[in-house]
């Protein structure tokens, strides 16, 4: 995935953790971004995303979920911003962000980790809420509305 030329949702934790230099190097093309094509956790999360959306719809009995990813863009103070959300709950104009994590992780940890990304997406999409739908290992699913 091309990561140059804009600030995206995945960059929010890097910014919040203060690793500005590495982000700047990647965004300006001075350094390649990490190759995640052989990262099992990343690939598994991508592969199970549609299943996660379907489970969310089934559990919450929602039929108005746009299943395809939605991209939002903005130019803010001359800085291109872009966010690709996993899905949208149309009736609420809410974002759905799907994650797949290890079994012993907690929703509290996931909220802490992904809150910057979710807030960024909500701002870009001009949405007041975001569902975080998380599969923990292969035994548990939880969802919260932020």
Where are these regions (language model features)?
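Charged, glycine-rich intrinsically disordered N-terminal tails and low-complexity linkers that flank
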Residues: 1-54, 59
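Nucleic-acid nuclease catalytic cores
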Residues: 42, 58-146
């Amino acid at each position: 995935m091309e990561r140059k030329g804009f600030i995206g949702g995945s960059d929010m934790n890097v910014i919040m953790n203060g690793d500005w230099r590495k982000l700047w190097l990647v965004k300006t093309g001075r350094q390649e971004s990490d190759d995640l094509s052989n990262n099992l956790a990343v690939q598994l999360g991508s592969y199970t995303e549609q299943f996660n959306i379907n489970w969310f719809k089934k559990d919450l009995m929602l039929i108005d979920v746009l299943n395809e990813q939605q991209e939002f863009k903005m130019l803010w103070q001359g800085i291109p911003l872009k966010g690709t959300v996993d899905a949208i709950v149309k009736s609420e104009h809410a974002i759905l962000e799907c994650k797949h994590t290890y079994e012993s992780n907690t929703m509290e940890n996931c909220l802490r980790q992904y809150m910057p990304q979710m807030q960024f997406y909500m701002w870009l999409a001009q949405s007041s809420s975001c569902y975080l739908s998380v599969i923990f290992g292969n035994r548990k699913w939880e969802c919260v509305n932020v």
